[in-house]
Structure formats: structure tokens, C-alpha cells
Amino acid sequence: MLVWICAGEASGDLLGARLMAALRRQRQGVAFAGIGGPRMAEQGLSSLFPMEDLALMGLLEVLPKLRRLAGRLDQAAAAIAAARPAVLVTIDAPSFTLRLAARVRPLGVKVVHYVAPQLWAWRPGRVKALKQRVDRILALLPFEPAFFEAAGIPVRFVGHPVLEGGAGEGDAARFLAAHPILPGERPVLVMPGSRRTETARLLPVFGAALRQAANDLPGLRPIVIAGRLVEAAVRQAAAGWPNGPILVPDGPGKADAFAAVARAGGAGLIKSGTSSLEMAVAGVPHLVAYRVNPVTAEIVRRLIRVPHASLVNLLAEREVVPERLQEACRPKPLAETLLRLLREPEAMAAQRVGFAEALGRLRPAEGPPSEAAARAVLELA
């Protein structure tokens, strides 16, 4: 049985790798083809082309790449038509993957889309088009099935992969043995994103905020998680940050950094997204920040339908984690919010209560998320 899998960015690559492993555990003789990154390659996938070609974010950021993306779409559709897999699993990256689904579903290929598009958050009218493109959605969040079921789209809540990502299982002692945090230092975990477009916008702002905060709190020590695609840019930017930042590759070792920051009473300055859930699992109080092109931001403002950007806040249905978005994503507001968090133990304790609330709603009844996802895929294959 051939399963064709398409991931478009680092988070999807990790999801795809876990899904591939779970599919192998549940079905003998399964084979894979598709598009993925290094994690999926470790599971035996030979990517049709570099996954990085699809890792774009923001309306204006995508426009200059449209011709290349169209070519990659043609290439992927032709490969699927030739292979005739039992099922196509598209993972997140809906601007590409759902177009691919639309091209191949008329061929009789079953399509499972893993990570529900956030149509419940903005432009809900698009759900009608989605119904024509997929046979099943695998939802990560517990409130998503009701939205898609109302539109007649089969959906399965499989739970969020952060629950099996090991974010809360790090070894603080191991990290501190390699990277001592001195008495009086307050670590700040910095996660500026894994896409080049994100880090290009956030790194200068985060750096300026850390410098401002260090003026009031001289012991502030940045610990920066650097994704593979952006490691060089992160390293270059962090060289000018205060007190000798510690760079940690985005991989299994980052959980040790999370544990060390939590033990040392530190906090996080985090790009809005799944990183916030990782911080919740690890018990690290934090604030989230995000900034996109001003034109993109104005379009999104007109279409957005939810009160929060942070997944922790959406799950808790209140603001657990401070959000500093767009105009508020500037050095001064970020520095002030970070300092307030570091100086107020009660604020940290309140966040941890909210983390437990939010995470309690993420756990599926069917076991680990990747196993639940594999079962849902095999039902259609």
C-alpha cells in the first residue's frame, strides 16, 4: 500500500514523520512517497523536491514565488497521478496542499488533510470549497470538529502533537552541565520561528526588546531555539544580544533548555503558534508576539473571527498568555511585558494554572495523536 504524504514546513515534517512511524506499526507493507523534510527522510521518504520551496508565510511574501509554486504544484500532481497511491495525506500548509488535493481527488485518490485549516478563525465561507477537496480532516483542536461537521465534512479529533513531543520531559541538569546559568541570572527562552519570513521580521524586534529589558535586569540571559532553516540568521542576529546568548538547535535537545528555564524561574519570548503550547507543556511562563507585513495584517484584521492568537488562550477561552501582535510587537511593549513576568511570581503561577486548563482539553480519547491519526488514515486507504 502506497501512502503519498505532502508536508510544507518544519512542523508538518515532524507530524509526517510521526505519522509514517505509526502507519508502519499499524500496517505491514506500507510504502511512502511525497514531499517532506529531514524528519520524514529519517523515516525513509525521498522527497520529490525540497520542502523548503513551500515554506512561505504571508500574502505579500508568497506573491513573488507564485510561478515557482505553480511549477511545484504541477510536479507534485503529476507524480501522484503516476503513482496512484491508496491515499494522499496533506499536512497543514493549506495554500499549497489543498490546491494539490483539488488536482488529484478527481482521479479517485482519497485525501486526508492533517491539521484543520483555521477557517473557524477567519473566512469561514471557504469551508464549502474545502468539502470538494478532502475526504477527511484530522483536527488537532477539540473545538474544530463541530465547525467542519456542520459543513458536512468528515472530521476526526486526533489530539495535538505537542502532547507527544517531549516538551515537558527535558533534563535541566544535562542542559545546565553544558550551559551553566550563574546565580543571579534570569534565563529568557527565545523562539523566533522556523520560517525565514518570520525570523526576518521578529529577530530585530526581539533583539531590541532583550537589550531594553537587560538594561533594567542585567542578569537576563537569552537562550535561543534556532530552527534548521534559519539557524544562520538566528546566530548572526543573536551575536548582538546581551550576556552571551545560548543557541540551541530546534530538536530533541530543546526540551532540556525548556526544563532549565523552568527550573531557574525564567520566562519565554515566543513567536505566536505551536511554540506557545510547547511552553505550556514545559511549564514555562511566556508572552507571545507576532508581526506580518502591514498590508497582510490589515487584510487579516478584516477577516479574523476569534478573540485570541495564542492557542493556549483559545483553549482556555481567556487570556492566560499576554499577546503582543503587530503594532504592539515593538521593543518597548515586549520588554515591559517580559520584565513584569520575570518580576511577578504570582503572574507566573497564574499562567501555569491556565496551562493545565488548556492542555486538559487537548488530550484525545484514542491514545497518542500520531496513533489516532494513523488509524484515521488507514480507515480510508
Language-model regions: role of each:
Residues 1-381:
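Nucleotide-activated sugar donor-binding and catalytic core shared by glycosyltransferases
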